[in-house]
């Protein structure tokens, strides 16, 4: 292991500037092919250890071609990037997309919901990408009601399923969501829901972009018809080359026909719109019934007392797994399991209702805003 300092020398550390000055100069020109690896972007690690996805120059280019066609991007846009650049959404959804079209880029160091609201108004931002949690926290600020959002064409939302209540809330401010679905391994976008479909296809992640294919398969990798739930598989020039130093994981993720197996559960409707149900690994099996946490979370988010919610499955002697709701409450609010079950009863089948409730100050999240459910399970297990 090597430690480098860029500011001053320290005992046992190597000085980066000194070594760089002594190094042989790079070749003036380097030949680059679209199949060459451009970056190694690590997955978010929400279900375990992150893996390094090798993304090529072609992957990045085709992602931005797909995004530009979907968003109708132009050089007149003002793009705000607040998602971290080590996250594929922060780097390749908006930032490289802005370079691609030559638009104005507002680049923030970190996410502060009050600062973001101020900058949306100050710079007359037209597009912003964020995780649902970011837009949720923004909406919870007192400044939200008075912020001028009239310049916004689209808020692009990804990284997790978007609660319908959040879509409806921003709709009251005249702001449209362009929901997207994708993964680090897909550079990332693999589906778009543009504003004209926001009402009629509410809850959908959209359609595959022009240069990408999507299909749903069963456990035996057989394609499923519209309306049936299965694993979402993706193919196109935006799919990664493989995982860095993980040929085993690459072979497991990308089949011989070039389909990337996402590990996400979803279905396509009759019109080819993709609906995301949940991660396969997050699915709870309670009493032999499959429960998709995202569905339960979407309902619970509508409860007036709940600020944040995550649903996980915890071991249970009777049911195998117990549907467990972990919530952070709005200030001054109280909530009991009995009250929550009674409130949610009209909206969820009985087997989907939480059997346990844990109230916390905040949910554990990674820097991209995704809830770390494996951390939650570890904490609850302790």
Predicted regions mapped to residue ranges:
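Conserved pre-ATP/AMP-binding loop-to-beta segment of ANL
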Residues: 10-11, 23-42, 49, 72-78
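Conserved AMP-binding/adenylation subdomain of ANL enzymes
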Residues: 61-78, 86-127, 141
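Gly/Ser/Thr-rich phosphate-binding loop
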Residues: 117, 122-130, 139-200, 213, ...
């Amino acid at each position: 292991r090597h430690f480098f300092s860029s500011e001053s020398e320290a005992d046992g550390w190597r000085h980066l500037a000194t070594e760089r000055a002594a190094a042989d100069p790079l070749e003036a020109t380097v030949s680059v092919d679209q199949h060459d690896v451009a970056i190694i972007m690590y997955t978010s690690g929400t279900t375990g250890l992150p893996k390094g996805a090798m993304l090529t120059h072609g992957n990045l280019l085709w992602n931005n071609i797909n995004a530009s066609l979907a968003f109708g991007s132009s050089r007149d846009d003002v793009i705000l990037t607040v998602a971290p650049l080590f996250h594929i959404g922060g780097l390749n959804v908006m930032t490289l997309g802005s370079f691609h079209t030559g638009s104005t880029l507002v680049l923030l160091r970190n996410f502060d919901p009050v600062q973001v609201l101020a900058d949306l108004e100050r710079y007359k931002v037209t597009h912003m990408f964020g995780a649902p949690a970011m837009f949720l926290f923004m909406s919870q600020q007192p400044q939200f009601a008075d912020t001028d959002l009239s310049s916004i064409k689209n808020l692009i939302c990804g990284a997790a399923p978007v609660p319908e209540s959040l879509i409806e809330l921003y709709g009251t401010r005249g702001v449209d969501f362009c929901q997207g679905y994708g993964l680090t391994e897909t550079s990332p976008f693999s589906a778009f829901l543009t504003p004209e479909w926001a009402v009629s296809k509410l809850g959908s992640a959209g359609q595959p972009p022009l240069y990408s294919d999507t299909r749903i398969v069963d456990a035996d990798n057989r394609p499923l018809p519209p309306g049936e739930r299965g694993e979402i598989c993706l193919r196109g020039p935006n799919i990664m080359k493989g995982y860095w130093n993980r040929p085993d994981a690459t072979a497991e993720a990308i089949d011989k026909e070039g389909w990337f197996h996402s590990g996400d559960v979803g279905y396509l409707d009759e019109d080819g719109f993709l609906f995301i149900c949940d991660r396969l690994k997050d699915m709870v099996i309670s009493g032999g019934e499959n429960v998709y946490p995202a569905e339960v979370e979407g309902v619970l988010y509508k409860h007036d007392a709940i600020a944040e919610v995550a649903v996980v499955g915890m071991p249970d002697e009777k049911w195998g797994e117990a549907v467990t709701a972990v919530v952070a409450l709005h200030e001054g609010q109280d909530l009991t399991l009995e009250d929550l079950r009674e409130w949610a009863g009209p909206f969820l089948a009985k087997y989907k209702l939480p059997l346990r409730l844990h109230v916390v100050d905040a949910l554990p999240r990674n820097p991209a805003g995704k809830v770390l459910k494996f951390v939650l399970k570890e904490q609850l297990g302790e």
